[in-house]
Amino acid sequence: MIPTRCNEINGSRPSSLKLAGESHTIKKTSSCKSKPRPHGRASPVIIYAHSPKVIHTRAEDFMALVQRLTGLDEIIRRNTSESSSSVVTEEVNVGDDNTAAPFSQDRTQRQKLTDMPLFTPSSMTLFGSPTQLMYMSPNRTDSFRPLVFKSE
């Protein structure tokens, strides 16, 4: 049965195509010739539909602000908006004025600060570190005391 297949493959072929005399080859123009492109991808161009907003908030209101802007549940959003002091402003032509007011160190401001680490501790940093980690603020008025971990 194999010879029959060979005969079919090696059988007669159709005649080759012939081109008309007025035909010519088409050459595609390269976009690289018109302007040189740097290697890699071109950086994206950001076009804003609206001017970006500058949001001013206190450190203790930051989490509530992020949750409000990212779509927290309406009931929780109403409760946090009563105590939030975040201000949304639009700043146009902001200069490089570095004369910011110094951080207020009065007693009311210090009471709002908490003694929490600004990193997520792993078990290694929690039990392998000689430093103390405070998880509750000592400025709280309730009967709880701060929880302190100290490795010896």
UniProtKB/Swiss-Prot annotation:
<dbReference type="Pfam" id="PF05678">
    <property type="entry name" value="VQ"/>
</dbReference>
<dbReference type="InterPro" id="IPR008889">
    <property type="entry name" value="VQ"/>
</dbReference>
<keyword id="KW-0150">Chloroplast</keyword>
<comment type="function">
    <text>May be involved in chloroplast development.</text>
</comment>
<feature type="short sequence motif" description="VQ">
    <location>
        <begin position="62"/>
        <end position="71"/>
    </location>
</feature>
<feature type="transit peptide" description="Chloroplast">
    <location>
        <begin position="1"/>
        <end position="58"/>
    </location>
</feature>
<protein>
    <recommendedName>
        <fullName>VQ motif-containing protein 8, chloroplastic</fullName>
    </recommendedName>
</protein>
<dbReference type="InterPro" id="IPR039607">
    <property type="entry name" value="VQ_8/17/18/20/21/25"/>
</dbReference>
<feature type="region of interest" description="Disordered">
    <location>
        <begin position="1"/>
        <end position="42"/>
    </location>
</feature>
<feature type="compositionally biased region" description="Low complexity">
    <location>
        <begin position="81"/>
        <end position="92"/>
    </location>
</feature>
<keyword id="KW-0934">Plastid</keyword>
<dbReference type="GO" id="GO:0009507">
    <property type="term" value="C:chloroplast"/>
</dbReference>
<keyword id="KW-0809">Transit peptide</keyword>
<feature type="region of interest" description="Disordered">
    <location>
        <begin position="80"/>
        <end position="108"/>
    </location>
</feature>
